[in-house]
């Protein structure tokens, strides 16, 4: 049975953003993909809703997704969308979580970590992180991962930022497409492992 991806956007850009659409196009090669937007985005506001409302919107989108598939469901999200997916998985059963740039440290502050939800998880999770992401220093993520109960995996993008983008000078002979294809392969492997 084909996997189903519920793809949540980050805080700053809606699901129509080219970055989201580009990844949606890739994910369609593995399974069915549905994107959605949080209420504040639909209302044209910049500031995200409070956590309970973000979770409620995400759960509503998940309920709609369940009506469309009986296959394995994966919550995938860019930054905030991945974090909210983690919260949703504490209340709803899904096959796995895929976080594209998890925002571990609030506003890049190493003392304010959004790690409790990760410690509470039972759902398998794949982190896709850039090594230059100020919102998720890899040393801090490593410490959190060591204390997590859920099966957790990390795909690191050397030189990648919060949007998984690698600067030209760091790419060498590679292209961003090469980097993205490796991310896609990691996602594909994770999904295959947890699709039963």
Predicted features, each with a name:
Residues 10, 38-39, 99-107, 130:
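Active-site nucleophile loop of the alpha/beta-hydrolase fold
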Residues 16, 134-140:
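Conserved alpha/beta-hydrolase "acid-adjacent" motif
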Residues 58, 160, 169-196:
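Catalytic active-site module of serine/aspartate enzymes centered on a nucleophile-bearing elbow/loop
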Residues 32-34, 147-168:
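Catalytic histidine neighborhood in serine/cysteine hydrolases
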Residues 11, 131-133, 159-161:
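Acidic beta-to-alpha connecting loop that harbors the catalytic carboxylate
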């Amino acid at each position: 049975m084909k996997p189903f991806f519920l793809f949540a956007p980050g805080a700053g850009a809606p699901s129509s953003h080219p970055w989201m659409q580009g990844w949606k196009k890739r994910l369609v090669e593995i399974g069915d993909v549905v994107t959605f937007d949080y209420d504040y985005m639909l209302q044209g506001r910049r500031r995200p809703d409070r956590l309970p409302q973000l979770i409620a919107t995400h759960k509503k989108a998940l309920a709609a997704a369940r009506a469309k598939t009986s296959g394995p469901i994966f919550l995938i999200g860019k930054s905030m969308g991945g974090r909210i997916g983690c919260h949703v998985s504490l209340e709803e059963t899904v096959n796995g979580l895929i976080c594209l740039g998890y925002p571990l440290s609030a506003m890049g502050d190493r003392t304010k970590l959004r790690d409790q939800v990760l410690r509470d998880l039972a759902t398998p999770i794949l982190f896709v992180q850039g090594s230059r992401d100020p919102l998720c220093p890899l040393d801090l993520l490593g410490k959190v991962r060591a204390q997590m109960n859920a099966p957790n995996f990390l795909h690191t993008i050397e030189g990648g930022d919060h949007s998984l983008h690698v600067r030209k000078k760091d790419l060498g002979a590679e292209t961003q497409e090469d980097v993205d294809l490796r991310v896609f392969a990691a996602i594909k492997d994770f999904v295959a492992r947890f699709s039963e």
